[in-house]
């Protein structure tokens, strides 16, 4: 694979045969560290092979007629680049403690293909559908796509109106689309549950406080002009789980952290949800680890843990709380690459314009801050 000369069908056949053998059989991976590492090697090879084939189909890069085409293309196929890159690196990380060098060259080539080709190429194509009077930034809406701030009305209230007794909503911080696609496949393949997948157009800028507020029932969203630029739903702060619970009380709902719900157990859990129609459950693993410099290299491991925890959480809701409908969503996603960013990848916007109220690495928010040729500019209204 590293030499770009492998027959991928032959490779997959070989991987399948080796997995069924003694040393890397999935039924025996708990036997020893070397057995688990061998199994991870084959996971990495399989992901790299699929990535190579996908890249060959898009060798000329990406081109979209508009934002709708870009979003549809991503959710249909392009998301696989992010997924396979994550799966490869997660598997390769499991091999590293053994001190084996067999994946090192392949890892370098995967990194070059992802951070040196895929991210820049997709970024260029995405930029083109943002700009201009008819671009996405001029009107943050796409035909056929639900905006994130309409989540409650379109996804929750619609089910209640249709007769569903109780809706459980799990919000997993930074749980991105490609990971959700993997979860849906796992759920449909291993359990009696039926899972489907759809996407929304996220709020801009995409960060936790705004994304979490957008998912709540509300009539208005606005910024409070204080030091933190708090997001207000219907004039009330909703930055904490308790405050979100207060907002949900207006629709006969409650808010709770995932760990706290699981700790209640079956009987107390049923008592907790008995008089409620809407239960918002907050899960945080990916953002907790991936958004900190000291632990960001654990991002892909956090995704793997999240897939397991969300499956367990949904199973608990259905089996122990008699839930019939569970909606799983996120406040935002994430973008992560193993190699550090080059200076060319970083914004050249050094000074904060007059009127800036909130300044972060990825965005600035303010009143009348104008436009800059070094950044994309829009209006939160």
Placement of each model-derived feature along the sequence:
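Feature captures the catalytic ectodomains and active-site-proximal regions of enzymes
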Residues: 1-381
């Amino acid at each position: 694979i590293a030499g770009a000369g492998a027959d991928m069908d032959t490779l997959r056949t070989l991987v399948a045969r080796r997995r069924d053998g003694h040393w890397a059989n999935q039924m025996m991976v708990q036997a020893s560290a070397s057995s688990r590492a061998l199994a991870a090697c084959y996971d990495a090879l399989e992901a790299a092979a699929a990535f190579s084939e996908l890249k060959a189909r898009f060798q000329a890069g990406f081109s979209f007629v508009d934002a709708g085409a870009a979003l549809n293309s991503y959710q249909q196929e392009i998301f696989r680049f992010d997924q396979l890159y994550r799966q490869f690196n997660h598997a390769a990380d499991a091999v590293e403690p053994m001190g084996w060098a067999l994946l090192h060259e392949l890892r370098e080539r995967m990194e070059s293909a992802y951070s040196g080709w895929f991210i820049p190429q997709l970024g260029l194509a995405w930029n083109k559908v943002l700009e201009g009077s008819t671009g996405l930034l001029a009107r943050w809406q796409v035909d056929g796509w639900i905006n994130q701030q309409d989540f409650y009305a379109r996804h929750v209230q619609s089910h209640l109106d249709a007769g569903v007794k109780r809706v459980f909503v799990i919000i997993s911080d930074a749980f991105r689309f490609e990971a959700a696609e993997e979860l849906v496949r796992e759920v449909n393949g291993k359990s009696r549950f039926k899972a489907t997948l759809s996407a929304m157009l996220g709020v801009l800028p995409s960060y936790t406080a705004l994304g979490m507020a957008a998912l709540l029932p509300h009539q208005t969203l606005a910024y409070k002009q204080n030091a933190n630029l708090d997001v207000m739903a219907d004039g009330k702060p909703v930055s904490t789980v308790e405050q979100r619970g207060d907002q949900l009380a207006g629709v006969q709902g409650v808010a709770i952290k995932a760990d706290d719900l699981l700790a209640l157990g079956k009987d107390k859990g049923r008592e907790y949800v008995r008089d409620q129609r809407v239960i918002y459950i907050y899960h945080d693993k990916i953002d907790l680890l991936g958004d900190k410099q000291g632990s960001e290299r654990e991002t892909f491991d956090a995704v793997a843990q999240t897939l397991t925890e969300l499956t367990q959480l949904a199973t608990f809701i259905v089996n122990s709380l008699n839930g019939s409908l569970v909606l799983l969503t996120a406040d935002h996603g994430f973008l992560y690459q193993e190699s550090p960013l080059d200076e060319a990848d970083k914004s050249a916007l050094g000074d904060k314009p007059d009127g800036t109220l909130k300044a972060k690495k990825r965005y600035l928010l303010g009143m009348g801050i104008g436009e800059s040729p070094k950044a994309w500019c829009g209006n939160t209204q």
